[in-house]
Design a protein with these regions (language model features):
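A short, exposed loop/beta-hairpin motif centered on an aromatic-Gly-Thr core
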Residues: 11-27, 32
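Short, mixed-charge low-complexity intrinsically disordered segments
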Residues: 30-62
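Short aromatic-glycine-(Arg/Gly/Cys) micro-motifs in beta-strand/loop hairpins
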Residues: 1-15, 41-45, 56
């Protein structure tokens, strides 16, 4: 299970949606980020690991 989490403030993240697959969670985060010009991240609920971060519609690549 994967969470889509929105950044409301520099130190405040709010869980918004849950998805069964990482791909669907990523597409949702990407779409919401482009539409709202906000930062979203996808987190794996099993390992509590961040799988991706999307800032203003652009993926962050590390």
């Amino acid at each position: 299970m994967y969470n889509v989490i929105k950044q409301e403030a520099p130190d405040r993240w709010v869980k918004e949606l849950y998805f069964q697959t990482e791909f669907r969670a990523y597409l949702c985060a990407l779409t919401k980020s482009k539409a709202l010009m906000a930062t979203y991240m996808v987190v794996d609920t099993d390992t509590n690991e961040v799988t991706s971060i999307v800032r203003h519609g652009k993926p962050l690549i590390s």
